[in-house]
């Protein structure tokens, strides 16, 4: 087995995961190994990325558990590092959580509503859109359930993941469309409340048009 191959990484991960994953050293080794695998194999390979995300999600759950039971900041830091890695690679739930990492917990939008969104399959459906398992996702819920704000958050992530692609959003009134535009801009432009630029450090705002409610990321132009 060649060192640095996918099979080699799988073997090393298995060895770590078969040990005590409640130990900080093993969790940190897992994180560092994921970073190395990303650099050596790249996550453009779907099999590699799917495997890495599976490992990362298990590790971040263990880090969250240990942070809650021990109160140790080291576990909490690792938890967020795993989420950042996942959020940078098209994971909706992780990206939504990480966007509000720096917000006061009582002021967060997503985390307090997360279990309800999960229970009704909303986040999984958004993930299925990202994974190309769904072409259309239709959601009908009563007013005040947070669907418009969730759309703001989701679209800000989609814009970061695909900055040179066209993403169209509209509503039944110009007021709601403008609200969506303002919401996405706030998430992108407010580094105190949101961590959008930590997730997408290489994506820059190139221009906005308030009249047409358009946002250009990465590069301008009609033909991106």
Task: Cite the ranges covered by each PLM segment.
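Phosphate/NTP-binding elements of NTP-utilizing enzymes
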Residues: 2-224
């Amino acid at each position: 087995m060649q060192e640095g191959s996918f099979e080699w990484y799988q073997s090393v991960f298995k060895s770590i995961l078969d040990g005590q994953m409640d130990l900080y050293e093993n969790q940190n080794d897992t994180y560092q190994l994921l970073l190395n695998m990303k650099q050596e194999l790249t996550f453009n390979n779907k099999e590699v990325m799917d495997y890495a995300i599976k490992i990362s999600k298990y590790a971040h759950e263990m880090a969250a558990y240990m942070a809650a039971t021990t109160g140790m900041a080291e576990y909490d830091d690792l938890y967020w590092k795993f989420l950042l890695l996942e959020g940078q690679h098209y994971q909706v739930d992780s990206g939504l959580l990480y966007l509000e990492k720096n917000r006061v917990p009582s002021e967060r939008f997503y985390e307090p509503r997360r279990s309800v969104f999960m229970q009704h399959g909303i986040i999984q459906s958004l993930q299925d859109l990202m994974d190309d398992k769904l072409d259309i996702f239709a959601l009908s819920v009563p007013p005040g359930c947070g669907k418009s704000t969730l759309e703001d958050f989701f679209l800000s992530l989609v814009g970061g993941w695909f900055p040179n692609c066209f993403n169209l959003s509209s509503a039944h009134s110009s007021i709601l469309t403008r609200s969506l535009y303002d919401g996405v801009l706030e998430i992108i432009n407010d580094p105190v409340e949101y961590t959008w630029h930590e997730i997408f450090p290489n994506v820059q705002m190139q221009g906005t048009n308030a009249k047409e409610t358009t946002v250009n990321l990465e590069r301008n132009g009609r033909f991106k």
